[in-house]
């Protein structure tokens, strides 16, 4: 099984790395003076600017950039909220689904606008086709484009010197959508349709079962209702944009959302495709490709470590089964391991790899149920989120988060040798460190605060369906997921309540936009600084030494913050299994 695991993970990484250079180079050109494919995309881009009255040549101060971004996303949230509340009276609702409740609509609007895609509802029984397409799918595009725009603003701040502007938000948003996200989503959605992913406006179909079954109360069930809908178009961008919200309740474990091994591989690859390629884009835009490779190496090493942990823990199986004499070890006749909550068509390796990739990348989609993982298997995706979603992370947001950690790393290195820290020729001073501290602390505070409120209040405990350490893990996972804009969940928590919808919605908004503003502030501050020539005392930020330092900073800051909480959840649960 070890060789099988290595081969499957190796193929995935090889294909991913093969896509980094061409896509990264293309995206660097998109954000340059003369983007590619202007003959096709140029007229569409110019038409949008003309209709909206945008001066594409006018650049913005970081404060104006932030105001435009916040205003755009606030309007998007209001529209999505209103669409959900009115869906019962709108077309493309063949199942005649009622309006979404106020608290659930708020939570969903906050979730999709913040690129979290946390879902406290079941998509096929809650959202009409119009809401899925016009509301959720549109936000999948623009929330991803928002993250990419912030990243490009930060990169410009690092690369430029003695200027007060970092670009134009409207141009960056438009180009991210038209030149990058839409073409990739179109290709992927058509490919997914070829694999059997549904794309139709037909209502749900009731079919006769070939083999009727008798349920627990003795009733014979001879029919099944199969949910349909325009799923492929939403699934493509939910993966490419690291959104993660599924069309169906069980997300990519659903046979009509992820039917074949090829669809599984393509959806998995799509999660990391843009975040990985943006590292190369970063290197090109700052004039040193080695910087991009160093960041990519850091992300890949951390991801591999947690993937090995998850695969090993799941393949080892459940100690409780072994005590009962159940054989769950790999052999010629069975795959072995902990297959509870997993699709046998994907197996342990593809399930555990997806679990770590989706939580490393702030995607949150699932092809297995994380709540059914072993304690250490569930700890791996939880910790990847708690690191701040910087191990690849969301499109744009992951890389700008890792660049903040890089700034902290050079600051720590500067303290150790008594030099003023600098990153890519720019001095890192008090203002940058204050903003970086905010970016690091806000998700941690929100995670621990919401966990504490939930476990200490009757409303929070009422829908925790497991007791003890695992029940605590479910609450901690939900708070971690919302506060780090991931969206995955331990499904044993009943989260579609006013309590969780409200608190998790607040966490998603705070952790998204309270991080974006200080990131843009750092971009503006760095853009106004002069370039410092390199000297013998300059810390190279492209070497294996710096990669090791950066990994250490990410792990120490993330791990130390949450060790007490993890000790009450997955760690103690693991120890109890061994008793």
UniProtKB/Swiss-Prot annotation:
Where does the UniProt annotation locate this protein? Cell membrane
**Membrane-spanning residues:** 1-21, 64-84, 135-155, 178-198, 265-285, 293-313, 398-418, 435-455, 503-523, 549-569
- Organism domain of life: Bacteria
Its main subcellular localisation, reduced to a broad class, is: membrane
Q: What is its membrane topology?
A: Multi-pass membrane protein
Q: How does it assemble?
A: The system is composed of three essential subunits: KdpA, KdpB and KdpC.
Entry-linked PANTHER family? POTASSIUM-TRANSPORTING ATPASE A CHAIN, POTASSIUM-TRANSPORTING ATPASE POTASSIUM-BINDING SUBUNIT
* HAMAP family named among the record's database cross-references: KdpA (MF_00275)
Name of the featured protein? Potassium-transporting ATPase potassium-binding subunit
Which source organism does the UniProt entry give?
Herpetosiphon aurantiacus (strain ATCC 23779 / DSM 785 / 114-95)
